[in-house]
């Protein structure tokens, strides 16, 4: 990429090793489940990325697989994960949420189910208010 004149190269990757930062590695932990256990594991994953010298890493806030946007227990997990994500090098909200939507069509990609909305306002006013505070805090820190 550099030979083609690209600068500030960033590659979103599922795996990396010590020295990968030389190649613009931005590592995320892959498609993990939506649970408090998976959130706890992200703390260790982030520490290991730092130990390996890889400064750019992220996690799917709220996990990727599962998590019903109407379930209070998942909302709590999501909010705590969002708070953690606000202090990660890259803040990334991504996931395949429940309840699933019916397929849009009968051919190609349209024949597959789709996940529920996953924007911060999709979880209700209370969750949105908390997430908004963390987004504002992150923006304040970014400007420092």
Predicted features by range, described:
Residues 1-144:
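Catalytic-domain carbohydrate-binding cleft regions of carbohydrate-active enzymes
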